[in-house]
Structures are given as C-alpha cells and as structure tokens.
Amino acid sequence: MSKVYDWFEERLEIQAIADDITSKYVPPHVNIFHCLGGITLTCFLVQVATGFAMTFYYRPTVTEAFASVQYIMTEANFGWLIRSVHRWSASMMVLMMILHVFRVYLTGGFKKPRELTWVTGVVLAVLTASFGVTGYSLPWDQIGYWAVKIVTGVPEAIPVIGSPLVELLRGSASVGQSTLTRFYSLHTFVLPLLTAVFMLMHFPMIRKQGISGPL
C-alpha cells in the first residue's frame, strides 16, 4: 500500500497539498458563528445525496409526480427517511444561509478586498432561495401547484416584458406539464451546476483572502 501511495506522492505531491490545507492560520477571534457557511455547504451536500436518491423513483409528470412521491414515502426502502432528510436539510440550508449572510454583513466581511467574495455569496444565496421555489412544486400537489402559479405570475406586472417572461417560466400560457418539466430541470441540473460553479469561485477567494478581522 505504501508503494502505491509513494507512486502518487512522487507525481502529485499529495503531502504538500495536505499540509497547505491543514496549516492555514485561523484568527483567534473566530467563533461558532463563522461555521455557518460550512454548515450551509454540508446541508447542500446532503441535499445532493438525498435528491439524487429520489430521482430513481420520482416521475416529473403532472399525472405521476404526486403518486411517485407517495411511493417514495410509503413503499420505497427508506424512502420516507430520505425525503424527510431532504426536506429538513433544505429548511436548515435556508436558515443557515440567512444567518451566514447576516454574520458576514454585520462583521464587515463584504468590504475591500472581499467584494467579489461577497458578490458570489449573494449569488449563492439567490440560488439557495431558487432551490426552495423549484423544489416546492415538484410533488405537484395543491400547495405546489398554486405556489408555482403565484410565483410564475408575479413577473406579469412588469411592463412590456411581463407576459413573455411569464410564458418563458411556465413554458406555455398556463401552468402545466411544461412548467413542471422546467422546474424539475432547474432544480436537479441547472441550479446544482450553477451552485457548484459559484462555490468553486467562493471558497478559493475565502482561502486566499482569509477571514475578515474583528470589528
């Protein structure tokens, strides 16, 4: 086993990378509130794992979506647990994200030279809220249906572009299969991909610039 490790070490310098990661200086003023971003990331990873598991059973059609969710909750092995963890983690992720944004703002973490870190963080906050909006509709029950109808109808008040924007969100003039398909695609592919991209921008900047000093 050591020979295998030595082979990789010789080519990739794994130990040097590990030392750089584990030897980063942590300021003495850091406390539990500085862990909120990491907790948000942990919730996101739980969401990815449990969401991926549910895609094996969920059917994104207006006729089968609700029945497939019922199947997950009542018949699939540990389906009730996986979906429950997904829901609890979603609520926790939103809460931790809000607290994290407040902590960064109140401690001045958005100031120079961390403006771009703040911007990417705000984008991640918007993406987190978008996860909630799109995921809420996927069971396609009465609550989900009317939530989608209300949310997608909001842009209609915008002059000129309101109606085309509503049709773009819904996929047609009314809420239906096209809407569910779009929300499912957003929730399971587009939003996770964008979140991963902005996280890959967000974390290296934190790593490079370090944690902001105390007030």
From Swiss-Prot:
Question: Which superkingdom heads the taxonomic lineage of this protein's source?
Answer: Eukaryota
Q: Which residues bind heme b 2?
A: 86, 187
Q: According to its record, how does it sit in the membrane?
A: Multi-pass membrane protein
> Which residues hold heme c?
35
Q: Which gene produces this protein?
A: petB
Q: Cellular component GO terms, alphabetically?
A: chloroplast thylakoid membrane
Name of the molecule in the record: Cytochrome b6
Q: What else is known?
A: Heme 1 (or BH or b566) is high-potential and absorbs at about 566 nm, and heme 2 (or BL or b562) is low-potential and absorbs at about 562 nm.
Name the positions where heme b 1 binds: 100, 202
Q: Which NCBIfam families match?
A: PRK03735.1 (NF002990)
Its needed co-factors are: heme b; heme c
Sorted alphabetically, which PANTHER family does this protein's record hold?
CYTOCHROME B
How would you summarize the oligomeric state and partners of this protein? The 4 large subunits of the cytochrome b6-f complex are cytochrome b6, subunit IV (17 kDa polypeptide, PetD), cytochrome f and the Rieske protein, while the 4 small subunits are PetG, PetL, PetM and PetN. The complex functions as a dimer.
